UniProtKB/Swiss-Prot annotation:
Entry keyword set: Aromatic hydrocarbons catabolism, NAD, Oxidoreductase
Name of the encoding gene: mhpF
SMART domains: Semialdhyde_dh (SM00859)
Binding site for NAD(+): 12-15, 158-166, 277
Recorded family membership: Belongs to the acetaldehyde dehydrogenase family.
Active site positions, chain numbering: 127
HAMAP family in the record: Ac_ald_DH_ac (MF_01657)
Listed CDD domains: ALDH_C
Species annotation: Mycolicibacterium smegmatis (strain ATCC 700084 / mc(2)155) (Mycobacterium smegmatis)
Gene Ontology biological-process entries: catabolic process
Protein name as catalogued: Acetaldehyde dehydrogenase 2
Reaction catalysed by this enzyme: acetaldehyde + NAD(+) + CoA = acetyl-CoA + NADH + H(+)
Key word Oxidoreductase present: yes
Enzyme type, top EC level: oxidoreductase
EC number: 1.2.1.10
Amino acid sequence: MPKKSSVAIVGSGNISTDLLYKLLRSEWLEPRWMIGIDPESEGLARARKLGLETSAEGVDWLLAQSEKPDLVFEATSAYVHRDAAPRYEEAGIRAIDLTPAAVGPGVVPPANLRDHLDAPNVNMVTCGGQATIPIVHAVSRVVDVPYAEIVASVSSASAGPGTRANIDEFTKTTSAGVQNIGGAQRGKAIIVLNPAEPPMIMRDTIFCAIPEGADHDAITQSIKDVVAEVQTYVPGYRLLNEPQFDEPSVVNGGNHLVTTFVEVEGAGDYLPPYAGNLDIMTAAATKVGEEIAKKSAEASLASGAQA
């Protein structure tokens, strides 16, 4: 078995703690450190109990250590990561960014998982992006998509202070991802924090404008194939019904449309199952980290064989 890549988690909130449990199961990644700024954080306490080295002194502490991680997963906030990103790169640490900072290229596994495995910093877009961009990609690889709009509805109970502070970045980063990763010519993103009790699981609606005469069967099959791919790392990701095709009308702006409805139920590793919006972020980040670690291990084996 190849040597695992060592990992530091920067941030000690809900997303970081859920991520920790996923990383502990990984065959390719070894979480060694968790870094925060609150000494009383439940995340740091859990990490210590699980054998990680922890600190509440932030990134300064991590970068001052003689041994540094191969990978950093950062789940803080956009402005914090923008400050830290150049410091990670200078230290030779690859960064997987779970904030909307978008310092590095965005990665959504079904769309472009292998395109940026050598980048020093990759961005996981947003929870809404991870849930909806695969569908836009599924449609755009069959037909041109002049416009795509996504509506992500998540439980208010799953939106902590970090999520709420990042709402503006969420809409900008997700809209850009719908275009740059999903393949739509124009994109728009809307997030809804639903206060319903008991909390509802994440539900997303994806509208894609398509050409007249588009092959509905091919689009439907492409969507189902992508859903199956996402389910390999997020088992609770599913279609709510068959993709719906609509003729042009005043309501839809005169476009031929395909509308897809998905829901995301979390695995319940640390966060409750209704927090599928957070679970899909940590699961996708783990998937990307494992692919980076695999490529690094393959490169090491190849160089060793040549020597």
